[in-house]
C-alpha cells in the first residue's frame, strides 16, 4: 500500500511538471507567428560589440545560423575559432587622446551601424560586458513587431533624467558643472523629467530605416556636444524628435538570452 501511494505521488509530480512545461511552451509559441519566422529568416542579421581599452574580457559566442558577429576593437586581437568574433580593428589612440574623447568615439560606432553594416537589415548591439546565452531567433521573435525600428531596455534603477543626472554627478562620471548645464538646457526646452530612462547596453535596430538613421545621428550629436553618458540623452532625443518607433524590451527576455558580466575596470554607477 505504501509503495502504491509513493507511485501515485511520483506520477502526480510528473503530471504537474510536464503540464507546467507545456504551458511555458504555449506561452512562447503564442508570441511566435509562423509568418514572423519566415520574415525573420529573410533578414540579414548582424551582432556587434565594441571593445576599446581593457575594460572587459572577450566573451566567446556560439555562432547561430543566419547571423554574423563582429567586434570593433583597438586591441591587438586576431580572428580565432575560440571566440568566434570577426575582428574589425579601429585605431583611435593616435587621434583621440583623452579618455572621454575615446569613449565618445566608441559611441559613434554604437550609434552608426548603418555606416558599418549597411548590407544588413537588422543589427543587435551588445555592450562588451554582455555574453549571449540563448537562441537569438527566439529572442527576436518575442520582441519584434512590424511598426518599431529601435528596441532597447528601460533603466532598472531609475526612471527620470534628474535622478540620472544626480547619479552621474555623484559617481563623478561627469563634472557637476556639465550636469548642471544639461539640466538647465532640458528645463529651458521643457523636457519632462518623467519621460522615462533607457538603458543602452543592448539595442536592436532596423538600422537602415531613414528615420532610425536620423534619430541615431541626432543622438550622437548630442553625445558629442555634451556628455559621453549616452543614457542622459537618448530619451531627450526620443522626446525631441517625436519618434514613434521605439519599443522597450521586457527585462525578463534579456536575462533569459544574455548574461551580464562585471567590467574589469568596474563602473560603479548602476
List the predicted regions and their residue ranges.
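GT-A fold catalytic core of metal-dependent nucleotide-sugar glycosyltransferases
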Residues: 111-168
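Extracellular structured ligand-interaction cores
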Residues: 44, 66, 125, 199-202
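N-terminal Sec-pathway targeting helices
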Residues: 1-10
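A residue-level signal for conserved active-site and pocket-lining positions in enzyme catalytic cores
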Residues: 47, 69, 114, 129, ...
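Short His-Asn-centered micro-motif
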Residues: 48-52, 72-74, 126-128, 134, ...
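N-terminal anchoring/stem segment of glycosyltransferases
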Residues: 9-106, 116-120, 225-228, 240-243, ...
